[in-house]
């Protein structure tokens, strides 16, 4: 018994005395210097959630932040996003490729401003600006991003659709965004599917982005309404749809695996 207690004591001491790494999710609140260092490290290494933010833009934004207030964080990035929007509007007159790139950078910086969720006035503003920048970017890429709206319980739900150039009707990946990602991320980061003749339908999970529902039991019904809509389109092969749920959206993908088993080919729980 004494040996067992001693072993337990030594094991406990070893964990306390020896430094070890933990995931960001299990770490406590960061100080401002810690937050800045981690944000810059992720930008430098192209790591999520700021993997598309230029390191120089991150340094510029962080230099303007002097507190942990969400609005101060958002304002610093909004300023940079606004600059990219001006560049994009100017480039539209002569160089659509450059305009697309500037709209993309604007969206990515605004997206960093609103991350992880739109819970303050400036973060809400950043999200509105991100949607506007993305809409312009989506028009200029190939294949373009189509904004689709479908009826849902007296309202309109919003999603995105991209179809491969030469396949009609096209099979689809039905992509649901995670807790801190948005449908914009889903629809422009899956080009490999498009190159292989598979379209992308992207939608926000309940409680995030432009979803008309909060997270609750039964909120998957918005996805059923989306399937209803997709069945009305002649350019979509509604008999060949696979649902992909990223991160927390894997929960919704799993649910759709049995609630919509007769209308989908399968689900991928990715997260």
Residues of each region from the PLM?
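The serine-hydrolase catalytic nucleophile loop
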Residues: 179-191
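Alpha/beta-hydrolase
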Residues: 176, 203-205, 270
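Conserved alpha/beta-hydrolase
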Residues: 193-210
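Short beta-strand element of the alpha/beta-hydrolase
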Residues: 169-178
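N-terminal alpha-helical interaction modules that lie
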Residues: 25-78
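N-terminal cap/lid segment of alpha/beta-hydrolase-fold proteins
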Residues: 77, 118-167
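Primarily recognizes the serine-hydrolase "nucleophile elbow" in alpha/beta-hydrolase
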Residues: 229-271
């Amino acid at each position: 018994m004494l040996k067992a207690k001693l072993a337990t004591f030594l094991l406990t001491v070893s964990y306390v005395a020896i430094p070890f790494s933990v995931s960001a999710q299990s770490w406590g609140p960061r100080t401002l210097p810690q937050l800045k260092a981690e944000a810059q490290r992720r930008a430098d290494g192209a790591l999520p959630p700021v993997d598309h933010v230029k390191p120089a833009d991150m340094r510029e934004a962080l230099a303007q932040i002097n507190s942990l207030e969400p609005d101060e964080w958002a304002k610093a990035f909004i300023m940079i996003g606004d600059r990219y929007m001006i560049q994009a509007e100017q480039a539209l007159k002569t160089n659509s490729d450059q305009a697309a790139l500037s709209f993309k950078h604007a969206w990515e910086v605004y997206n960093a401003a609103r991350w992880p969720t739109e819970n303050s006035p400036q973060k809400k503003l950043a999200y509105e600006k991100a949607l506007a920048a993305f809409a312009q970017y989506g028009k200029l890429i190939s294949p373009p991003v189509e904004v689709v709206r479908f009826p849902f319980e007296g309202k309109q739900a919003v999603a995105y659709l991209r179809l491969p150039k030469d396949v009609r009707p096209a099979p689809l990946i039905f992509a649901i965004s995670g807790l801190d990602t948005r449908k914009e991320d889903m629809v422009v980061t899956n080009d490999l599917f498009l190159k292989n003749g598979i379209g992308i339908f992207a939608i926000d999970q309940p409680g995030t982005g432009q979803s008309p529902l909060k997270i609750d039991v039964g909120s998957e019904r918005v996805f059923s309404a989306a399937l209803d809509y997709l069945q009305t389109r002649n350019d979509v092969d509604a008999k060949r749809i696979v649902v992909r749920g990223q991160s927390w959206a894997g929960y919704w993908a799993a649910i759709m695996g049995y609630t919509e088993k007769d209308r989908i080919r399968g689900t991928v729980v990715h997260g």
